[in-house]
């Protein structure tokens, strides 16, 4: 065979062709992607928050401004003191099915069992002034009657008007809640804790608690707030404590202060997703009281505690009217209390 017809085999194979060059990565590309990702997450969170706020605020039942014309026409500027009228009614129609309805009687309609003015100085203090429902007042177009009658005959607007005329205190916002709604709000926070020095009961309202710090559920909290025949167990027997409606307003303030403490507590963060929509779903408010305003006031109140809350019931005394009915009327001390409320000063 002729070997010259075959090409010679090289001693070493030729080197492989060079790999294609990769484009150099631009510095900072990962950081830019991370920033864009965070911006996207923040945008989603903002829109989710806006949606949540809108959804929550949409649950509030509003009173048309044309039906609540007596509110103070000049609203305070942001950060300025603001006055609320907070009322609770005895409307039985929304009571939860598992509550004992026998404790609420047979009254049809609704009356104001709680009338409380709140003066909020953002970030500084809150003042509460309870008004007795039997306070003798002059109701426009209806003559002399008890304060809570103004709500029965003329609704929220006439009540606001009567209170402003009798006290000289401007009311900027109005909030109403009924028994059932108040109970649901309490339950949304896991109950409200009240300290009882002695066992207490009220056979009419349904209150029945042992001594010590007791966490009341919504139904029992309402029973405590409604109690007018409050009894304590001492020295082997039950004894009435007296005080009637005035003592009851003090118990109502107890609950308000304790609820405030619980909402302001860091531990309440776990309950807020339930509390906020429950609160909104169970109140009626004027159109000007936006959830944004409530949130701003709530944020300003987070730095406060019960020592920053002054509370009092308007000083009154018993009085028999010319119509033969029982009323209460302001004492000489009432003027100084009202003046302190208006000024945001400590009560005398």
Show the residue positions of the predicted features:
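Terminal targeting segments of Actinobacterial cell-envelope proteins
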Residues: 1-34
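Entry/capping segment at the start of metal-dependent catalytic domains
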Residues: 25-123
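Extracytoplasmic
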Residues: 79-82, 110-115, 123-126, 131, ...
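C-terminal solvent-exposed extensions
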Residues: 94-96, 135, 216, 284-348
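Second-shell loop/turn segments in exported
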Residues: 103-106, 145-153, 168-173, 211, ...
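Extracytoplasmic/secreted envelope proteins and their assembly/folding machinery
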Residues: 112-115, 144, 156-164, 179-183, ...
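Amphipathic, coiled-coil-like alpha-helical scaffolding segments used for oligomerization/assembly
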Residues: 148-210
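Flexible, polar/acidic helix-loop-strand segments at domain edges
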Residues: 187-270, 348
